[in-house]
Amino acid sequence: RTAIQESSDPSSNPSSLPSINPSVAVTPAPVTLSGCTNPMFPTNEEFKKAVKEYISQECSTNSGCAIGQTYGYPIGKWCTTGITDMRFLFAGTENFMSRDVLFDEDISEWDVSSVLNMEFMFYYAPSFNQPLNNWDVSSVSNFGAMFNGASSFNQPLNDWDVSSATSLGSMF
């Protein structure tokens, strides 16, 4: 038999076979936006440190940067499952000496479903303007000043569920 014949044979693909016990439901493993289920960062602090290093090493223009070699490149592909605190994550990401922007990358695939606090996350990150509408922010309670000073940010957030929010002050 050829490989094509084997792959089209239903008995070689258990998922195509009828269930032996149709009353038993099979629950698939949790799926996140980024496709990861195992946390990459054991603590919020380690995650924040890695982000700061990624920015300071200018990894957005240097795929060979050290932190990119450690956690992968680009930053938008990092597994953020389990992170609960993103306060001040990209705050002030501008080089005030040269006025060069240090961060404006796509992080739309990050799993933020466990995040509770996004306070000041993009505070004075003046060039950040990436789509975030598909983020699951339903667990976030603090959005205070999240985009305050992020003068370029102009993306829709109409799909966000902010029903858990206790602070939305100065969000923009």
Please provide the spans of the model-predicted regions.
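Short acidic, low-complexity intrinsically disordered linear motifs used
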Residues: 12, 16-20
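Negatively charged
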Residues: 1-8, 20, 24-172
